[in-house]
């Protein structure tokens, strides 16, 4: 499967790139953080244009960024808008707290209250009131297009790995894990 990184500098360009990627058979499109705004919101806006394509929000996450509980809530909104096609994609740098953040996101996408005892993001009785759209929770992807291998502390943390395609720098190979 192939994915595409959307890189346009304006929303009209993002829409055009997404539509072209869908028409060319891309399985997923990924919107990154940029001056255009939040990638989760931008990905949600593309949902009606590419009804059979996974919609990814690509985030270079660090501890000073969005708390995993807020990230889980925001991606739930994307998942509801796109009918269960959301992908939360993490870009480097990969740090050990990221594995815990992923675990907390997954816990908050499941029914009931989440209790998380981790050293970085302890949470007691947290609930994500809205539920993801489909039978399954949003997928987690790790962008390895600039790396040679997956860090050991993230083995098993993702559903998808994104690998580079040498012939197409704005594209990636999607590997299900």
Feature map (PLM): residue ranges:
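Active-site-adjacent structural elements that line small-molecule/cofactor binding pockets in enzymes
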Residues: 1-177
